[in-house]
């Protein structure tokens, strides 16, 4: 009888142990199954994320059409020039952005930037204290030049700003050259008669050579571009020298991010020689260097 009871107890114990083993195996099997099912799902999600195109931010670039060799419409109706082709090259090197060029009068560019109609200005813009008060600039200059007085070839009476007192001097509204003249007038009781230009840059030659105005101020590279017939001349010492940069909205995080990205692209363009080649092709000299060659 005791033997029978003992055998019965041993049988119950064996079944209990077997049951525990079965539960553990089931749990492990369940975990393995879940992991096996989760792995392909995670792989599929990762693959989908990899296949999803990176986000591209559209950037509206403001430029002009009236500056020969810089930003103008060619004989085929195409917008081109140094600034235009350079910004296209920068766009090619920044896959996270897509640049959309919008043209407008030069005098409207900075206002359009302020009102967020455009995101940056590309129009050989000089950095100066007046502009720095309202706008932000990238750090890596893509050109550098000097401003001087420009007069008719046969004019030997003008050599300095003081000689422009009582004279008509042509300049573009909101330009760096206009600010030189306006600052002079603030200190000299509006001695210079500033005439703000409405036409294209090459209209300067006809206005000066015809005597409608007496002079203008221009960067050193500009003269051979707008005056191939050599009717004008640059005289006197340089009035200012400046880095040429892109202009952005101030205190704007997205603008700063874009500015930093453009700086990186310009460094690449300088390093591989592309920037210098574009300058020589369009402007006749490498004005990307500190000293014009």
Predicted features, each with a name:
Residues 48-124:
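Extracytoplasmic small-molecule ligand-binding "clamshell" domains
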Residues 65, 143-151, 228-264, 285-293:
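Periplasmic-binding protein-like
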Residues 100-163:
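Acidic, polar ligand-binding/catalytic clefts
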Residues 84-94, 155, 162, 174-175, ...:
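Extended ligand-binding regions for polar small-molecule ligands
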Residues 15-19:
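C-terminal motif of bacterial Sec signal peptides marking the signal peptidase cleavage site
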Residues 108, 125-134, 180-185, 206-241:
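A ligand-binding cleft/hinge motif common to bilobed small-molecule-binding domains
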Residues 48-51, 55, 97-100, 176-196, ...:
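Ligand-binding clefts/hinges and TM-proximal coupling segments of bilobed small-molecule sensing domains
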Residues 99-111, 156, 194-206, 242:
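Short helix-initiation/N-cap motifs at beta->coil->alpha
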């Amino acid at each position: 009888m005791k033997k029978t009871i003992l055998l019965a107890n041993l049988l119950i114990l064996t079944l209990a142990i077997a049951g525990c083993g079965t539960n553990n195996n089931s749990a492990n099997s369940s975990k393995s199954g879940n992991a096996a099912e989760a792995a392909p799902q995670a792989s599929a999600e990762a693959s989908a994320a990899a296949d999803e195109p990176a986000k591209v931010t559209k950037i509206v670039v403001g430029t002009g059409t009236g500056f020969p060799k810089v930003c103008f419409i060619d004989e085929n109706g195409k917008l081109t020039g140094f600034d235009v082709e350079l910004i296209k090259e920068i766009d090619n090197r920044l896959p996270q952005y897509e640049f959309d060029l919008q043209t407008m009068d030069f005098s409207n560019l900075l206002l359009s930037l302020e009102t967020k109609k455009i995101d940056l200005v590309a129009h050989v813009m000089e950095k100066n204290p007046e502009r720095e008060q309202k706008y932000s600039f990238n750090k890596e200059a893509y050109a550098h030049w000097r401003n001087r007085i420009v007069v008719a070839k046969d004019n030997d009476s003008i050599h300095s700003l003081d000689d422009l007192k009582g004279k008509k001097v042509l300049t573009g509204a909101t330009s760096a050259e206009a600010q030189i003249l306006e600052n002079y007038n603030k200190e000299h009781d509006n001695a210079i008669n500033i005439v703000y230009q409405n036409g294209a840059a090459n209209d300067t030659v006809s206005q000066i050579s015809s005597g409608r105005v007496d002079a203008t101020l221009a960067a050193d590279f500009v003269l051979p571009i707008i005056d191939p017939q050599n009717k004008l001349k640059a005289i006197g010492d340089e009035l200012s020298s400046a880095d040429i940069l892109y202009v952005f909205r101030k205190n704007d995080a997205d603008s700063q991010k874009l500015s930093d990205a453009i700086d990186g692209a310009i460094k690449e363009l300088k390093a591989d020689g592309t920037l210098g080649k574009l300058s020589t092709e369009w402007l006749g000299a490498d004005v990307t260097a500190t000293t014009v060659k």
